[in-house]
Amino acid sequence: MTSQIRRAAASIPANIAEGQGRDHTKEFLNHLSIARGSLTELETHLILSDRIGLLNEVEVETLLALTDRISRMLSRLRKSLEKRVES
């Protein structure tokens, strides 16, 4: 479980960076979508870690608050980029 959490967590900024380095906004949007999927996967692993006793509830709540904040940032970035594509 620990390796899955690390992999999902590392995938989020990696996909954002890769998307930003692409030539087209649509490609960036695609990578943001992948990053969002990795974030959702991370949230799931955190919840499961609490249920099976790898992390305690306080740790998981703190981490889930951070994932929620990241999710909102990704959504705002996505909306901003979608406006560029529509223009």
Residue ranges and their predicted role:
Residues 1-87:
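Short, C-terminally biased terminal segments at protein or domain edges
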